[in-house]
Amino acid sequence: MRHILERIFFTSFAKKGWLKMLCAFEGLVDEKTKERLRKRNYHGNTCLHIATEEHRGRQAIWLIEKLVEYGADLDEKKHCDGDTVLHMAVKKGDYKLATWMCQQLSMRFGSRKLSQPHGVSSSIEKR
């Protein structure tokens, strides 16, 4: 029962942008919670995809940072079209989020050369 409630809560918090409520769960996060954050809703989206669809700029970044801290995966692809959060941010013109995402990816991969998704780097550079 707890796993169903957690998934509903995290999905709702991501959709509504309730960062304070999300932060209130900090002490309750365990390995099982991390697995549940990667689960998909009935549309095939994770909490990260929902936060990206519903919010822009700084608000999206704050939510995504917290979800990743709890165990969500930045590289998770949407079920329907294979887009990552970075693809979604670029497609909707949220270049603040896209730039932040690129910074996160380069920090995670260090000096390893990244192969950027087609059109992402050129779209960001135009802004």
From Swiss-Prot:
Superkingdom field: Viruses
Q: Which InterPro entries match?
A: Ankyrin_rpt, Ankyrin_rpt-contain_sf, NF-kappa-B_inhibitor
Q: Which residues form a coiled coil?
A: none
> What GO biological process, any one, is recorded here?
symbiont-mediated suppression of host NF-kappaB cascade
Q: Which UniProt keywords apply?
A: ANK repeat, Host-virus interaction, Inhibition of host NF-kappa-B by virus, Repeat
What molecular function terms (GO) are annotated for this protein?
A: NF-kappaB binding
Task: Give the matching Pfam families.
Answer: Ank_2
Q: Where are the ANK repeats?
A: 43-76, 81-111
Q: What is the protein's known function?
A: Suppresses the host immune response through NF-kappa-B inactivation. Possesses ankyrin repeat domains required for NF-kappa-B binding but lacks the regulatory regions required for dissociation from NF-kappa-B and degradation. Therefore, prevents host NF-kappa-B release and subsequent activation.
Write down the PANTHER family for this protein, in alphabetical order: NF-KAPPA-B INHIBITOR ALPHA, NF-KAPPA-B INHIBITOR CACTUS
Which family does the entry's similarity section mention? Answer: Belongs to the polydnaviridae I-Kappa-B-like protein family.
Protein name as catalogued: I-Kappa-B like protein J1
Give the organism the record lists: Microplitis demolitor bracovirus (isolate Webb)
